[in-house]
A protein has these predicted regions:
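Conserved catalytic core of the tyrosine transesterase superfamily
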Residues: 1-297
Length: 297
């Protein structure tokens, strides 16, 4: 194993153990960095990411654009390398930051998909969940996503000790292993506790599959997709849609943007501001019903 391979191995180990990123995210990092190494090796006979130069990154970005890669995909690839450089500089393996000053293609503004409030209400009121331990598990999972806005990776990582029934809180470890305490409704806590008592398997994790194994991304995605399609016409029905829905519905009901930022675990308020557009659009729709608007009709 070469020295550069050892550094990458240690980096991925750091992502898994210290930043607690999901398997899916780790694979994305590996794919992005492998592509970067291949390009460097083919064009500059260099396979050590610590020796990257800014002009090489610019050249790679141009190449990706020629291949008609989406701007969002290019941004993600460079973001993967940026995360690696932060790790490498902290370890004393790099001095400068070759990403600095590199201009990336402009991102198109993409509004988050959101499930309407009436659709979410019908999901919980129309008895769509089976009357069984795994039916209650599914309902608890959907409830947690909608009530807390947690990420898929955060839900999968939840353990029994993270739930505090007395304080009605849930301990969540977000990006960078940042811990936050999420308030929970008593109904949700009771649902989770009932599901745990009824399930026929012993496990240290809060949720398990039908076979008693730890949750994995595609399992949760399929469950969320199934239930949301029962009440929604959205083309994309994923756990992240429920995160968008949580944030938008809170803001629609008058929550402060800063409070929503903390609940979502965002490090920057700018990341949360995208949800304000959805609430603005709703206000515009409501304003169409204004009596003053009828003067011109």
């Amino acid at each position: 194993m070469t020295s550069s391979s050892i550094v990458l191995y240690e980096f991925f180990d750091f992502l898994k153990k210290e930043r607690r990123v999901s398997v899916h995210t780790t694979r994305s990092y590996k794919s992005d960095l492998d592509q970067m190494i291949t390009y460097m090796s083919d064009h500059y006979e260099e396979d050590d990411l610590c020796n990257m130069k800014s002009e090489w990154i610019r050249s790679w970005v141009v190449e990706l654009m020629k291949l008609n890669k989406a701007p969002r995909s290019i941004h993600r690839k460079i973001s993967s390398y940026r995360t690696f450089t932060k790790y490498a500089r902290r370890k004393g393996l790099m001095d400068g930051n070759p990403v600095e000053g590199v201009v990336l293609p402009k991102l198109e503004k993409r509004l988050p998909n959101v499930v309407p409030e009436h659709a979410m209400s019908s999901l919980f009121e129309d008895n769509l969940f089976e009357d069984s331990w795994n039916g209650r598990r599914d309902k608890a999972i959907i409830s947690l996503f909608y009530e807390t806005g947690i990420r898929l990776s955060e839900l999968i990582a939840l353990r029994l000790q993270d739930l505090d029934g007395q304080r009605q809180t849930l301990k969540v470890f977000g990006k960078g292993s940042k811990e936050r305490q999420m308030p929970l409704l008593q109904d949700t806590i009771s649902l989770i506790q009932t599901h745990i008592k009824e399930r026929p398997f012993n496990a240290s994790t809060l949720f398990i599959t039908d076979r008693g194994k730890s949750l994995y991304s595609s399992f949760v995605y399929r469950k969320v997709n199934y239930y949301l399609r029962e009440v929604s016409t959205l083309q994309k029905c994923s756990p992240h849609v429920l995160r968008h829905t949580f944030a938008t519905h809170l803001l629609n009901r008058g929550a402060e943007l800063a409070a929503v930022k903390e609940l979502l675990g965002h490090s920057s308020l700018a990341s949360t501001q995208i949800y304000t557009h959805n609430t603005t659009e709703k206000l515009k729709e409501m304003h169409k019903a204004s009596p003053l608007d009828r003067r011109n009709k």
